[in-house]
């Protein structure tokens, strides 16, 4: 068991570093940061969200989310809307350019996953997918209990 813990720790660490390197290189999403990719994806699936809702779904502090949103507003991908009754309530939604960017990113993501799958033995893919599902559930459960 001790060996398995160490082995999984090393694998998860390498995976995390690989994603960090991918984001820093700007290649993961065509020059778009990974956080921007996730925010665009969440907005494309949910439509208009308040900043609080988007921060919660991203798992980020509101101040961090605000910086990400500011950049995406400047790039013309999303727009802010003030609340009708409460002007302090701010929501965000995709612009037409944001929707186009989301479609581009979705296609890039699919191509990236296809390249990864080509490097795996075809008969192992279902097993890999199921294992990743279990890992994600376990990590999400741990994140939720440590908040």
Give the role of each language-model region.
Residues 2, 6-9, 107-147:
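Terminal interaction helix/tail motif
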Residues 22-64:
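N-terminal helix-turn-helix DNA-binding core of bacterial DNA-binding proteins
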Residues 67:
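DNA-binding alpha-helical recognition surfaces that contact promoter or target DNA
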């Amino acid at each position: 068991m001790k060996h398995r813990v160490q082995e999984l720790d090393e694998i998860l660490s390498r995976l995390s570093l690989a994603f960090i390197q991918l984001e820093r290189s700007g290649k993961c999403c065509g020059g778009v940061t990974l956080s921007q990719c996730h925010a665009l994806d969440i907005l494309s699936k949910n439509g208009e969200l308040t900043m609080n809702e988007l921060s919660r779904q991203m798992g980020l502090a509101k101040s961090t989310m605000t910086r990400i949103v500011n950049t995406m507003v400047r790039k013309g991908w999303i727009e802010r809307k003030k609340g009708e009754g409460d002007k302090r309530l701010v929501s965000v939604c995709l612009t037409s350019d944001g929707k186009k960017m989301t479609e581009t990113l979705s296609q890039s993501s699919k191509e990236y996953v296809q390249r990864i799958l080509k490097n795996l033995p075809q008969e192992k893919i279902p097993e890999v997918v199921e294992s990743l599902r279990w890992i994600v559930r376990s990590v999400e459960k741990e994140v939720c209990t440590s908040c």
